[in-house]
Design a protein with these regions (language model features):
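Metallocofactor- and cofactor-centric catalytic cores in central/energy metabolism, strongly enriched
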Residues: 2-412, 419-422, 427-498
Length: 498
């Protein structure tokens, strides 16, 4: 099957997206006749369908993605040089609910996971070492390597020390955010045993931190305060870790329904194909999982700017709508208070890949949330309380946002990318390429190829293949970031460092 040269995403769009590089003089058929390409235009970029005056809107996905900086001719390459964002400051919004039922059949699908005492299910069974403060990162890493050498990982999936720079010299929200995220990591179902390791004199006082965990299982979570150890703190830590290991190594996978899955949705290194391949594929999966009773979480609040009303009007209640409005405007205020414009998000890589404005990026980004109603809105560091589609307050930064998704309780993060990235957070971070070229050139980074969608594969066919892949990972198949050992955490910081 011959691949199409371009795609008009919505019938109301005044641009098409090039599915391959297009050359001067090539024809594009429109409802008003044939136009000719005026400039060499790379794949993923936009070509204008009709003459447009200065300040007139550029329409993509059926919505404005900005306005023309100057008069533009039909056939012109539309990019960041001739289009400008419409975004500015905070806005007032009106709740106009547009909630559509998901007409997706229920399927009896299962995976084998680790059932935890609180009813949550893990897809990994790892030993984690969680520093309360960055001062003990080195000890934590040494303990992890020593336990790995001693046990050879028999009966468990991994041993990880989650390094970070915080836990001291922080005040206010930064201090609380650090404590919340570290608490969430300790309570995550993907771990079968946690050693909380403290220095002892830090702002994040160990005894107070342990109180945040509530009624925790003392056979699964233990504390070591290194300043209180007389002698070798490494040996003291190993004595605790051996007990945690022997407990976790007894855990066995059990068959559970897919409604136990909580999946984070993230994109990074996006390009012009993100909104027509990988993000819609993830959105189709999200709708399917929610129809089965499962949960997905969408974040990257600054990358919702320009598409936020779509999500707001999918909120189930006026209260959820108001929480979403606050989430959006709080992030805009955060930008403005730091002297940053709200619409200058697209990175050099985004622009090179065909994304020209933040609206362009946002309308593609939010497609990862499919069409399901918004059932929950979470603050940073807050854990999932209701099944269905949740929105989470966190920035667009890949490491910070992915960590926040995992901290909310997601057992896995689906990460779409057009440019490619190797990183992963503290849960399996599955990379989905927007184009086949990336999938072929970076097989050591990428786990699944959504580029097939512009090469003749039907969405339903690829979605089903994608579901099978996700369930295989839930059953224990490693994704590339796990194979490579690229796993880390990053915590959101807003204020001063003492």
């Amino acid at each position: 099957m011959k691949q199409a040269a371009y795609l008009q995403i919505n019938k109301n769009d005044n641009v098409v997206v090039c599915l391959r590089a297009m050359h001067v003089g090539e024809e594009i058929k429109t409802s008003h006749g044939i136009i000719h390409v005026l400039r060499e235009t790379p794949a993923g970029h936009k070509i204008l369908l009709h003459d447009t005056n200065q300040n007139e809107p550029i329409i993509k996905y059926g919505y404005p993605i900005g306005h023309a900086k100057e008069p533009l001719k039909a056939g012109e390459w539309v990019n960041e040089k001739n289009i400008k964002t419409n975004l500015s400051g905070t806005l007032e919004y009106e709740y106009q609910p547009r909630i559509m039922p998901l007409e997706i059949e229920h399927e009896d699908r299962y995976f084998k996971g680790f059932l935890r005492r609180n009813g949550e299910v893990g897809i990994r069974n790892e030993i984690w070492i969680v520093p309360t403060v960055g001062c003990v990162n080195g000890i934590a890493e040494r303990l992890a390597r020593q336990l790995e050498k001693e046990t050879q990982l028999k009966g468990i999936d991994g041993i990880r020390a989650w390094h970070h720079n915080y836990g001291c010299s922080q005040l206010g929200d930064d201090h609380e955010n650090t404590r919340k995220v570290l608490r969430d990591i300790c309570q995550h179902p993907n771990t079968g045993g946690v050693l909380v390791i403290s220095l002892g004199c830090e702002n994040n006082q160990p005894e107070d931190f342990m109180k945040l965990l509530g009624d925790y299982d003392t056979e699964r979570i233990r504390l070591l305060i290194t300043q209180q150890v007389e002698g070798d703190e490494v040996e003291a830590g190993m004595n605790i870790l051996r007990k945690l290991y022997h407990k976790a190594a007894q855990d066995q996978r059990e068959e559970v329904s897919v409604n136990k899955l909580r999946i984070g949705l993230k994109c990074g290194g996006s390009d012009g194909f993100s909104g027509i391949t990988a993000n819609p594929l993830v959105g189709a999966f999200s709708d399917w999982l929610i129809a089965q009773g499962g949960t997905t979480v969408l974040t990257e609040v600054p990358e919702m700017f320009g598409a936020e009303t779509i999500l707001m009007n999918r909120c189930l209640t006026p209260q959820l709508f108001q929480k979403t409005v606050k989430m959006i405007n709080d992030f805009k205020t955060y930008f403005l208070e730091h002297g940053e414009p709200v619409g200058e998000n697209p990175s050099p890589g985004n622009k090179a890949g065909g994304i020209s404005t933040l609206e362009d990026k946002a309308l593609g980004c939010t497609q990862k949330g499919g069409h399901a109603p918004v059932c929950g809105v979470l603050s940073y560091g807050e854990r999932i309380e209701v099944n269905g589609l949740n929105l989470l307050s966190a920035p667009g930064n890949d490491l910070v946002a992915a960590t926040a998704l995992a901290a909310s309780g997601c057992q896995m993060v689906l990460f779409t990318t057009g440019r490619g990235t190797p990183f992963g957070t503290f849960v399996p971070t599955m990379k989905i390429s927007t184009n086949s070229k990336l999938y072929k050139t970076k097989p050591n980074w990428i786990d699944f190829n959504a580029g097939e969608l512009v090469e003749g594969t039907e969405m339903q066919t690829l979605r089903n293949k994608f579901i099978d892949k996700i369930l295989a990972v839930a059953n224990g198949e490693k994704v590339q970031n796990e194979v490579n050992g690229y796993q880390e955490i990053a915590i959101f910081k807003n204020g001063v460092t003492l």
